[in-house]
Amino acid sequence: MITQRQNDILNLIVELFTQTHEPVGSKALQRTIESSSATIRNDMAKLEKLGLLEKAHTSSGRMPSPAGFKYFVEHSLRLDSIDEQDIYHVIKAFDFEAFKLEDMLQKASHILSEMTGYTSVILDVEPARQRLTGFDVVQLSNHDALAVMTLDESKPVTVQFAIPRNFLTRDLIAFKAIVEERLLDGSVMDIHYKLRTEIPQIVQKYFVTTDNVLQLFDYVFSELFLETVFVAGKVNSLTYSDLSTYQFLDNEQQVAISLRQGLKEGEMASVQVADSQEAALADVSVLTHKFLIPYRGFGLLSLIGPIDMDYRRSVSLVNIIGKVLAAKLGDYYRYLNSNHYEVH
């Protein structure tokens, strides 16, 4: 453990370095730390010996090491902090007409990326926790049809498919009936399980040839098992990391898995400093924050950036955007669930 004065010195060096990205000397610290320059230098040397500070090659000043940033995050950073100066700018950025859920999630991701200069990722509610609350099949022609699904009574998912060659109209009706009887109102996790267990047995009762029917089930419902991911500022990753991080961000499903793994069960927020199990994120910092999507569950708002980021402001922005987004979503879902009257 370090002393209170050493902790104050480390915190101040982190604050000054993230603002200027210049090594910090004892004279700069003396303006805030009420100790002699010699005492401060001695404490800085001890912090360096502990691996929390690093000596700059071009000056006598010190800068935080990755371990120093991590210590600061774990012992001094408040994950619920908010800087009131950013509230107005975030609210103003959200002043737009949203026509669907995806509009708001994409906008929030862009706002966070633009205000930080880093990479932002937003995830919808985890697929396994969503429920299938509506299903229909619309025949578009003699050869293709559209499966129209509703998740959580509000999120539409459509899948266009070619009607199998041996299908008759009654076969499409049977397909829909099986879904309504066996899968409707179940969670996506239940659907995944039933497609491997119950459905193959049920299909045998309705169809002579079952192979293409089971393939159709897999094709139509595979969309439900995918994460809905919104990435903004991907090219920014090239300024604080290497090409592997940039390429990793192209694999949105793997990005979603890694971000969810970084948040422990029951946690609402976390900050990982060069601590991700994913190799492409091992040398960056990842801030993750859960936000409420009314009536449906929690989404995930993440910021990926350099180890030497301004953590206080980044955490503040993540918190503000999460709160404003949740409020915006609350208005959106209240509107969807209310009676709508045309105004003349």
Swiss-Prot record:
One term of GO molecular function: DNA binding
UniProt cross-references to Pfam families, sorted A to Z: HrcA, HrcA_DNA-bdg
GO biological process, one term: negative regulation of DNA-templated transcription
Keywords, sorted A to Z: Repressor, Stress response, Transcription, Transcription regulation
InterPro entries documented for this protein: GAF-like_dom_sf, HrcA, HrcA_C, WH-like_DNA-bd_sf, WH_DNA-bd_sf, WHTH_HrcA_DNA-bd, WHTH_transcript_rep_HrcA_IDD
Domain of life the protein comes from: Bacteria
Function: Negative regulator of class I heat shock genes (grpE-dnaK-dnaJ and groELS operons). Prevents heat-shock induction of these operons.
Similarity annotation: Belongs to the HrcA family.
Protein name: Heat-inducible transcription repressor HrcA
Taxon lineage: Bacteria, Bacillati, Bacillota, Bacilli, Lactobacillales
